[in-house]
Regions:
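Glycine-rich phosphate-binding loop and adjoining helix at the ATP-binding site
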Residues: 5-17, 21, 29-34, 41-100
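Amphipathic alpha-helical linker/stalk segments
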Residues: 2, 24-25
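Glycine/GP-enriched mid-protein hinge/lid loop-to-helix segment characteristic of carbohydrate kinases
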Residues: 4, 8-9, 69-71, 77-79, ...
């Protein structure tokens, strides 16, 4: 199921509702919880997006934890997608066996994660390693280096349409 992020936070939430309902219909026992891995800066205690790039309209302020717990009556946890990728690398991937892992992802945005002794390091105000949002030369880092922006720049330099380069991202 495509996210269709351009439709905004409410549309994404509706898709999450549909996915959870479908999954609940397929399993014999009631699920014991829901975990959401999402783009944006996440307040993990509240389970809410406190900042998101403009790629997803009306995403900042989404209260995933509250809305999902209210609807499905089971616990919900929400974490940044790059932090989840960092945990996966730490537990099963290239960082397995290390005490500290620094993870960098490059996709539609640029994200970072620090895992120390098996735990996500969230830092001050849940913003540790949010490298994509670092301010650089009147812009943020992900605007300067994200795959989508690099694709646009390459297509401009080559005088070609972005469509030709989209499959590369």
């Amino acid at each position: 199921m495509k996210t269709e992020a351009e439709k905004g936070g409410s549309a994404i939430l509706e898709k999450v509702f549909v996915i959870v309902e479908k999954l609940q219909g397929r399993i014999q026992e009631k699920a014991s919880g829901i975990c959401i891995s999402t783009a944006g800066m996440v307040n993990t205690e509240q389970g809410a997006i406190f900042y998101s790039a403009p790629l997803i309209p009306n995403y900042t302020g989404m209260q995933f934890k509250k809305l999902l717990e209210d609807k499905f009556k089971i616990p919900c946890e929400v974490e940044n997608d790059v932090n989840c990728a960092g945990l996966a690398e730490y537990r099963s991937g290239a960082a397995k066996g290390s005490h500290v892992a620094l993870i960098l992802t490059i996709g539609t945005g640029i994200g970072g994660s620090i895992i120390m002794d098996g735990e996500v390091y969230h830092g001050f105000s849940n913003s540790a390693c949010e490298v994509g949002y670092m301010h650089m030369n009147d812009s943020d880092f992900q605007t300067l280096g994200a795959a989508s922006i690099l694709t646009k720049k390459v297509s401009e330099w080559k005088g070609e349409t972005e469509k030709k380069w989209e499959r590369m991202t």
